[in-house]
A protein has these predicted regions:
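N-terminal secretory signal peptides that target proteins for export/translocation
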Residues: 1-4
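Bacterial N-terminal signal peptides
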Residues: 8-19
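Boundary at the C-terminal end of the N-terminal hydrophobic targeting segment
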Residues: 22-28
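Catalytic cores and adjacent binding grooves of peptidoglycan-active enzymes
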Residues: 33-38, 122-178
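N-terminal targeting signals for Sec/Tat export/insertion, comprising classic cleavable signal peptides
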Residues: 38-56
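Loop/turn elements at helix/coil->beta-strand transitions in domains of secreted/extracellular proteins
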Residues: 44, 96-101, 155-158, 166
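Active-site acidic/histidine clusters and adjacent loop/turn architecture
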Residues: 52-104
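Charged, often glycine-rich, active-site loop that binds/positions anionic groups
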Residues: 111-125
């Protein structure tokens, strides 16, 4: 084999090895986005990494969407991943990155939404829960007022404070408060 061809081949092999190695290393060093949930109605728990750096895991997103299904009907809707990013950032901002988030309400079908409205629960007609863009939560050991204030400071969507019911609503719609 001529020297030029051999040296070009060796250079190519080294280049490929370096590229593969750096791609693998880059992925493995990306920060994992992890969420831990406890659903207050289904009594199910979920501990899941749904994102590495800027790459979402489609299987993990599907598992979380199923977990946050309408507990009255069993219907599942694909959640807006910005909700998960908001929850992740909220746990970091309250200084509890490994906190288990109590889910009071996730996705709601139109039927469940109307059921709650007709029973005087103060539910919005066009609730973002029906678009899988909202979630009602609390974090054990963190006051709901602190959770509310922290969510408001993030300016990432709507924040509703339900002190009497001990939960906070967060969504990824327009920034507003109630």
């Amino acid at each position: 084999m001529p020297l030029f061809v051999r040296s070009s081949l060796i250079t190519w092999v080294i280049l490929v090895a370096c590229c593969c190695s750096s791609t693998e290393t880059a992925f493995s060093t990306q920060v994992p986005y992890r969420l831990r949930f406890f659903h207050t109605h289904t009594v199910e728990r979920l501990d899941i990494v749904y994102r590495h750096g800027d790459k979402y895991d489609p299987d993990a997103l599907a598992r979380i969407s199923h977990y946050l299904r309408d507990h009255r009907t069993g219907a599942v809707h694909e959640y807006d991943p910005r909700v998960f990013d908001l929850l992740h950032d909220l746990t970091l901002a309250i200084g509890r990155p490994d906190a288990e988030i109590d889910v009071v309400c996730g996705y709601r079908t139109a039927w469940s939404n109307e059921y709650l409205r007709s029973h005087g629960h103060g539910v919005a007609t066009h609730s973002l829960h029906m678009q899988a863009m909202a979630i009602d939560i609390r974090v054990p050991g963190v006051s709901t007022s602190k959770l509310r204030d922290t969510a408001l400071a993030l300016h990432r969507g709507g924040v509703g404070y339900y002190a009497a019911s001990n939960f906070v609503h967060v969504d990824v719609g327009r920034v507003r408060r109630w």
